[in-house]
Amino acid sequence: MRPLPRVHAFTDAVLLAAPEFGIRAAAIAAGGPAVALHARARGSGGALLASGARRIMALARPPEAAVFVSGRPDLAAALVANGVQLGSDDLTPGDARRVFPHGWIGRSVHSVEEAKAAVDQGADFLVVGSVYDTPSHPERPAVGLSLVTKAAALGRPVIAIGGITPERAAEVRAAGAYGVAAIRALWLAPDPAAATLAMLSPWMGDA
């Protein structure tokens, strides 16, 4: 597998349907192999997710940004995506591996216990959050940087999510995160390309 990207740009159903989606996706994808675009459209049905994932594939390929699909290892396999990210209500990493054998498989976790279970089930990386309070999940209390550190000690790359901004990326890295994930800080930035590079900055020069 190619190296796991450091910056992960998650979509949602609103973003996938937005007229400017293609322009913003191309700007984020310009970050190249250190960037992954995640097709995610929870609650909207499979058609929007599939069409969005195909659009992302077309936009990401020239700069070689990675493409991940959320919750659908079957779609990830059909598109030959680089990875799949699983929520707590999705298949286990082990079951997803049977459908999607050749790419990265991540699992969203919100506690040390969930992180340990995901590792035991074969997750390649952990999406840990919400690290900070975030409008995306106002009902979910922030887990803080301590969970990032504890999850990283389990030996899997940790992607921190939830309230992540370029200004916070350095402290997240210092806590042990391999990389970060965001929605608003990337997709809704005045300059998505610049925001992506700023988010990536703490990891510049890392292998």
Predicted regions located by residue number:
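A short, flexible beta-alpha/helix-coil linker loop
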Residues: Y132-T134
